[in-house]
Amino acid sequence: MSRYRGPRFKKIRRLGALPGLTNKKPRTGSDLRNQSRSGKKSQYRIRLEEKQKLRFHYGLTERQLLKYVRIARKAKGSTGQVLLQLLEMRLDNILFRLGMASTIPAARQLVNHRHILVNGHIVDIPSYRCKPRDIITAKDEQKSRALIQISLDSSPHEELPNHLTLQPFQYKGLVNQIIDSKWVGLKINELLVVEYYSRQT
């Protein structure tokens, strides 16, 4: 299954706010109407919607998300918490959380087009897993810095999660540590996602 490229507002109207996909927000009235039309949801549908929320927020294909779930299952600790940490530490998501890109798809484009350096080296893989002490910078070219400046200027300037530090005038972000689960940028019940996959495999 490929990455979703359809109308973004349609997805947030059904699943709720997905800040990684779009900075638009659903109208509360339309949320209530959708709930009343759908009636009582089955447990399967509830789990499916949480999984879809995770997939669309981080911009993953079904195969990619399943791969992350399998990695999380093999790691120590809560599978759901490890899954969220893996997704949050992706390079495209780190750029988004720093405000260097307005959405995760925009961050992915920056990486694909070789505008981003990690520890002084160009990285063109959006799924690159960042680690503590990584230094993320824009390439020292006018176009690269101009693209990031647009995002920094339009960023809502919310409090940065505690695992990141931004130095905007140097177009630089620092990864201080692995993300703490309370700073995950999406309202999600990750246990329902794990349950969904445990029933599929």
Swiss-Prot record:
GO biological process terms, semicolon-separated: ribosomal small subunit biogenesis; translation
InterPro entries, per the entry: Ribosomal_uS4, Ribosomal_uS4_bac-type, Ribosomal_uS4_CS, Ribosomal_uS4_N, S4_RNA-bd, S4_RNA-bd_sf
Subcellular location: Plastid, Chloroplast
UniProt keyword annotation of Ribosomal protein present: yes
Residue numbers spanned by region Disordered: 17-44
GO MF term set: rRNA binding; structural constituent of ribosome
Keywords carried by this UniProt record: Chloroplast, Plastid, Ribonucleoprotein, Ribosomal protein, RNA-binding, rRNA-binding
Cited CDD domains: S4
Keyword Transmembrane helix attached: no
GO cellular component: chloroplast; small ribosomal subunit
SMART domains for the chain: Ribosomal_S4, S4
Pfam assignment, any one: S4
Domain S4 RNA-binding: start-end pairs: 89-149
Subunit note: Part of the 30S ribosomal subunit. Contacts protein S5. The interaction surface between S4 and S5 is involved in control of translational fidelity.
Family: Belongs to the universal ribosomal protein uS4 family.
Chain's role: One of the primary rRNA binding proteins, it binds directly to 16S rRNA where it nucleates assembly of the body of the 30S subunit. With S5 and S12 plays an important role in translational accuracy.
Protein name: Small ribosomal subunit protein uS4c
Source organism of the structure: Solanum lycopersicum
Organism lineage string: Eukaryota, Viridiplantae, Streptophyta, Embryophyta, Tracheophyta
